[in-house]
Each structure stands twice: as C-alpha cells, then as structure tokens.
Amino acid sequence: LKLLAHISVSQAKKAGSDVVKQDKDPKLGNLVYPLMQAIDEILLDADIELGGLDQRKIFALSRDHIEQLGHEKCAYVMNELLPSMSKPGAKMSSSDLYGKIEFLDSKELIQEKLKKAYCVEKEVKDNPCMDLARLIVYPLGHTILECKEYSDLEKAWVEGSIYAGQLKEALAN
C-alpha cells in the first residue's frame, strides 16, 4: 500500500493505457493493474523484467517510483508483441485458443493452430506467420524452406514462390 501514496490516478491511468481498457469511468482494477506489476517487481526482488512493448509505460512507472520505497531499480527488456494468429492487426489473447501459441503446446496443437492461422499469400503486413518467422524462428538461428535469412523468406513470399500451406507447415516443424 505504500506505493499508492506515491502514484496519482492520472499516473496509474497513463501507465496502464496500452495494456488495460481505458474509459471515462475506469474500473478500479484497471488502475491498480500497473501498480500490481510494480509490486511484483518488489516482492520478487527482480533484477530484470521482461515484457512486450505494451508494458513500456508500466515499466516507466516502476522505474520512477520504486526507489522511493527503498528498492533498487531493475533492468527492463522489451520485445515486439506477436500478433494474434487468427485475426489481422490484433495482439495475442489468452481468451482466443487459436490466436496464440503457448510454450507448453504440444507439437500437434501447434500444427493445428498454424493450419488455422490467418495468412494472406504475398502479404507481409499483419501476417502472423511472417511475424512468427521474423520474431522467433530466424532470431533463434533456424531457417525456413531453405531461406537462410528472413529477408530471403520475405522476398520469396512477396514474389509468390512460397504458398501459405508451405509456410505454415515449415513453421510447425
């Protein structure tokens, strides 16, 4: 509760604006969410916190107030968010079974999810299969369909020499 004495309603709203739904009369939980994340940092005695780019304002709130409570700042590492596998332009959601791939999903479930994934041929923008290749597969040192670099895959995709079914199957394997 000590943290509550240091943070205003407008600061809490701003910190959560990219993560929780904001409206004129927000639910208390929407305002408390960023504070809970900051408190987790304290209770876990975290040296580093990993999150998506949408967590940036929450991390800034923690950074700005954590020392006032006698705790050391931690390092924040942010990465791009993977989009929903089932809807263009949306982020992954825990409520959409086929919209996300989880670490503990079986190979069979991953294959099933990728078969159903939104994937417009020759399109790179808002294409979750291409984002998965760019953000996960290639940075981990893997290749897809003999394309050594992501740029090679993108070029082949845009030219139409790779089809959606081929890409999805390669991602699943």
Each predicted region: which residue ranges?
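Divalent-metal (Mg2+/Mn2+/Ca2+)-assisted nucleotide/phosphate chemistry catalytic cores
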Residues: 1-75
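Conserved nucleotide- and phosphate/pyrophosphate-binding catalytic cores
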Residues: 38, 44, 56-173
